[in-house]
Amino acid sequence: MLDISLIMLGAGNSSRFELPVKKQWLRIGSDPLWLFATKNLSNFYTFKEIIVVSKECKYMSKFAPNYKFVDGGETRQDSLKNALELVSSEFVLVSDIARPCISSELFHKIIEAAAQADCVVPALKIADTAYLGENAIDREKVKLIQTPQLSRTTLLKKALSSGEIYTDDSSAMRAIGASVWHILGDEMARKITFKEDLVKISALKAPENELFVGSGFDVHEFEKGRPLVLCGEKIDYEFGLKAHSDGDVALHALTDAILGAAGLGDIGELFPDTDDKFKDISSIYLLQEAYKRVQSVGFVLTNADITIMAQKPKLSKLKSKMEANIAQALNLSQSRINVKATTTEGLGFVGRCEGIAVMASASLKFYNWTQI
């Protein structure tokens, strides 16, 4: 058995995907695409190391604590160089997380060809007429290069150290005189780049119909001379709430609930009160940015429930406006948002009119890419 490590490249921003969710976080069943693609390859072979390159290493490690995670670079090549620093095996197999349908047949053809060259590459032929600019070219000479690509580790490290930019491993290997062997690729191994490419994974399992629930709690004390804002609604009252931001304690609790349901930490981690750029910032903005983060990793909000505990001011007549503000900010139906207001019957710091406390809960489900 060959000594091989696996590198999965997944540090892209999905800028061409044009959906709120990054493609690496589309769910196949309950697994995100990057994990599904990695498990798929690891089912075919016992790798010395499995290394995933990402810009979300801390979050990804929750899903696969036995993998190694490496921060991505500015380019694919930078990302690969970062990952290669952890590789000590004789061979390294490099693939993209956006190729979830690599077959066992293709994989084993690559491994079996290892003795043929320093780098083994799957490539597709083209059936259509091809042009380069205004000139027709011989399509028999055109190859569409795919991954995974198998290389000798020492040679690939050398190839990438030159400073030249290459779009795949085989190009770098060829540039240093290493031998490259092409095998026939597989249509199912085509890369998902655009949302229209989702048809390529239409045979895979749709996202599980799971529900994820998070809770949030926050407290702010009253402060003279500040405006009072709750759920994005400015309220006529003699006190505002002491805070680094605009002090919207209700939205802070809701933001924590949404982040918690996705396992993404809390509002203080995303928007620390030690950062001056968040000074007096609108909590509507913070909520929207947090929700974008939640959407990017494959979730959508199904409903939210907020309980505001305030002895004063009276809020019952403002609840519908508060719900509408949240619904508009998150582009949801108001029927998905519920705001309640209560007192503590004169008990505690809320009862003494020293501040306001809020509890919130939120539920999320997976983004359903099969309905696009």
UniProtKB/Swiss-Prot annotation:
Pfam families: IspD (PF01128), YgbB (PF02542). InterPro entries: IspD, IspD/F, IspD/TarI, MECDP_synthase, MECDP_synthase_CS, MECDP_synthase_sf, Nucleotide-diphossugar_trans. Its cofactor is a divalent metal cation. Keywords: Isoprene biosynthesis, Lyase, Metal-binding, Multifunctional enzyme, Nucleotidyltransferase, Transferase. GO terms for molecular function: 2-C-methyl-D-erythritol 2,4-cyclodiphosphate synthase activity; 2-C-methyl-D-erythritol 4-phosphate cytidylyltransferase activity; metal ion binding. A divalent metal cation binds at residues 218, 220, 252. In the N-terminal section; belongs to the IspD/TarI cytidylyltransferase family. IspD subfamily. This is Bifunctional enzyme IspD/IspF. It comes from Campylobacter concisus (strain 13826). The lineage of its organism: Bacteria, Pseudomonadati, Campylobacterota, Epsilonproteobacteria, Campylobacterales.
